[in-house]
C-alpha cells in the first residue's frame, strides 16, 4: 500500500535503510526534500517509467460513496455493471529503485548555438549567485555545454544517469553543490523557481 504523502519522507527513508526494492507514488515536490534529494542525486532512487504519460498526472478509481463529483474526471461502467469514478491527480510521480529501460534513453539535444538560433534567440544567462547558466526548458539543454546548468525539476522525467550528473539544487545549503548559498538562485536580481544543477558526463 502507498502511505499518505505527509509520511513520504519517513517511508522512503525506511525502505532505503532496510535495502528494500520499491515502487511508490509521491508528490513531485518531494524531489527537493532534504531526505529525498540526496537519494536522487546519488542514483539510489529515480522516477518510474510512465512519468511522461498524461503530462505528469495519474488517474485513480475512487469509491462512489466518497466521490466528489466536481473532481471526477470520468465515469465508466465496469464488467459487473457498476459505475467507476475516475479522478485525475496532477504533479505526482512513481519513485523507485527498480531499473528500467527508459531511464537509460539518451536525451536528444541541440548544441548551444542551435538552441540560441532556433529557440531562445539570445545567449544563456548566468545566475547572480551560482556559477551556472539558467536553462528554463529541458529541451533547451545544450548538448555541448561543459559547465553547470540549472534546470527545472521536471528534468528528472528525462534524466539519464549515463548522460548527466546531478550536482545539487537551489533549495538549501545542504543541496548547494558549493555549500555556500541557501535557498534560491537569482537571475538579474529575481529569484527563479526550483532548479536542479546538472552537467554532462564526460564521454
Task: List where the protein language model places each region.
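Class I S-adenosyl-L-methionine-dependent methyltransferase catalytic core
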Residues: 4-203
Amino acid at each position: 500500500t502507498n502511505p499518505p504523502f505527509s509520511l513520504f519522507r519517513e517511508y522512503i527513508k525506511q525502505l532505503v535503510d532496510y535495502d528494500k526494492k520499491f515502487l511508490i507514488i509521491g508528490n513531485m515536490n518531494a524531489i527537493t526534500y532534504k531526505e529525498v534529494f540526496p537519494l536522487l542525486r546519488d542514483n539510489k532512487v529515480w522516477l518510474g517509467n510512465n512519468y511522461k504519460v498524461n503530462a505528469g498526472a495519474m488517474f485513480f478509481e475512487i469509491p462512489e460513496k466518497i466521490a466528489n463529483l466536481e473532481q471526477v474526471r470520468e465515469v465508466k461502467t465496469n464488467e459487473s455493471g457498476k459505475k467507476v469514478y475516475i479522478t485525475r491527480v496532477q504533479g505526482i510521480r512513481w519513485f523507485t529503485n527498480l531499473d528500467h529501460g527508459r531511464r537509460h534513453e539518451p536525451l536528444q539535444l541541440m548544441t548551444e548555438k542551435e538552441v540560441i538560433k532556433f529557440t531562445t534567440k539570445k545567449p544563456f544567462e548566468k545566475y547572480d549567485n551560482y556559477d551556472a547558466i539558467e536553462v528554463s526548458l529541458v529541451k533547451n539543454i545544450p548538448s555541448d555545454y561543459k559547465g553547470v546548468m540549472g534546470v527545472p525539476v521536471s528534468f528528472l522525467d528525462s534524466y539519464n544517469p549515463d548522460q548527466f550528473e546531478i550536482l545539487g539544487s537551489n533549495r538549501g545549503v545542504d543541496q548547494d553543490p558549493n555549500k555556500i548559498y541557501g535557498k534560491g538562485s537569482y537571475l538579474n536580481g529575481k529569484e527563479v523557481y526550483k532548479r536542479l544543477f546538472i552537467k554532462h558526463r564526460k564521454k
